[in-house]
Amino acid sequence: RGLGDVYKRQMLRDVGLEDISDGRLYRENDMVKTDTNSCQGCKKICCIGMGRTIVLDPYDCYRLGIGTGKTFEQLLDTNIELNMVDGCILPNIKMQTVSNGCSFLGADNRCTIHNYRPGICRMFPLGRYWEDDEHFYYILQKGECNKDNLTKIKVRKWIGIDNIESYNSYVIQWHSYIKKVQRALAGLSEEQIKILNMYNLRTFYMKGYEADKFFEEFKERLDKSIEMFGM
């Protein structure tokens, strides 16, 4: 997998936009050459050896729970794991021990959760290019998809999420919150960091959401958390 999320300021320091992408910035209604035609004829399996890079946000886990019928705790026993991401404990998809492939990859090397796959997988080979904590574009990453003859498709259709405006608003809210948490960690003790991480896991991942009311309930929990922590 590629970068997923990259920052303008980081890229200006380390690498240029043209080095990792086609150099263009895309919005939801733009056409982009990413359509793989369901990966037909592709001999490369891109869902192997991703390590801990498929980090899951609360909406990813909400959708996985609905699709698999498993609770967050049950998913932790099977397909996902917890790891540290810049000081925050966040879930990611686990790799299979023997094949090093995604734990949701079937015996036929096809995705078993395609209809409710995580956001990083939905975007691929697109990534988000963050101008700051609250504004992003999409970029088409270089050398990520091995399929030949990709065709053009509208970004919103490629991502395939209903009500993408609400989804994008949520993505920005969660991203901004995590960045605030990461900045706050510098002034906390080890015990306080542990408490904050457990709070976030319980509040946004473990606690269930009412069907079709994810975005509303998430926003309520987020606002309460920001007020409580004075962020």
Q: PLM features: what roles do these ranges have?
A:
Residues 8-73, 77-231:
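Short loop/turn segments that flank or connect secondary-structure elements
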